[in-house]
């Protein structure tokens, strides 16, 4: 789904100060029924992550952490089964999984002889049954499963979706009888920064030569696209020549402005591929 900047801004404006909940996403879908669920979820997640980055510091002051911890302790004393941490995260407008991490770190600092390592914290967040306090384990679990944008569950889902779309792209390339090298093959050849697929025989798409294709299982907004241009796409262009980026969940139309310079954007696999007869050196 390709959106104009104005269409994107309208959706983003609706996300100001809404909690990262499934209920919020359902309301967004009702407000924009013509947009796909996947596109809205991607925009929803990206906008919320921008918000968290802007407000992250205020939640990490020693005063804030101590206040949250005492509120957690008071809450579970009254009712340990109630979603105390989840409600607290929503009240102070902080991602539930990140709130769970804060409280878990504070709890372990108080109850363990040595400060907990990052790997231990991550392991406990992935598997809350490892947390030595049953009440806190349940509170952390509630935060993890109810967070739409952060946490180990979301990370696993994003990784799986990304892999799924890479497999889809591979199948489409094979279906078109296009020869290619994938990321693993390129790294075996010594390349450190590579696109998902290098075409061994270049193709033309809408009059533009394509040497490589990158799959992105997300929506291409200004922030993410400019970061990708800087960190990935221009490096690919410099090393391998012009290429194609597929944002499977759409992108802002105005961002497709580098076609003449060698980076083409699409929201699906192109159907009008013309195979060229010479191969990459």
Swiss-Prot record:
Q: Where does it localize?
A: Nucleus; Cytoplasm
Q: Which residues carry this modification: Phosphothreonine?
A: 114
Alphabetically ordered keywords of this record: Congenital dyserythropoietic anemia, Cytoplasm, Disease variant, Hereditary hemolytic anemia, Nucleus, Phosphoprotein
Tell me the GO BP annotations in alphabetical order. erythrocyte differentiation
Q: Can you quote a single GO CC term?
A: nucleus
The question of whether Phosphoprotein is a record keyword is answered with yes
Q: Where are the transmembrane segments?
A: none
Summarize the disease involvement recorded for this protein.
Answer: Anemia, congenital dyserythropoietic, 1B: An autosomal recessive blood disorder characterized by morphological abnormalities of erythroblasts, ineffective erythropoiesis, macrocytic anemia and secondary hemochromatosis. It is occasionally associated with bone abnormalities, especially of the hands and feet (acrodysostosis), nail hypoplasia, and scoliosis.
Protein function: Plays a role in erythroid cell differentiation.
**Protein name listed in UniProt:** CDAN1-interacting nuclease 1
Taxonomic source organism: Homo sapiens (Human)
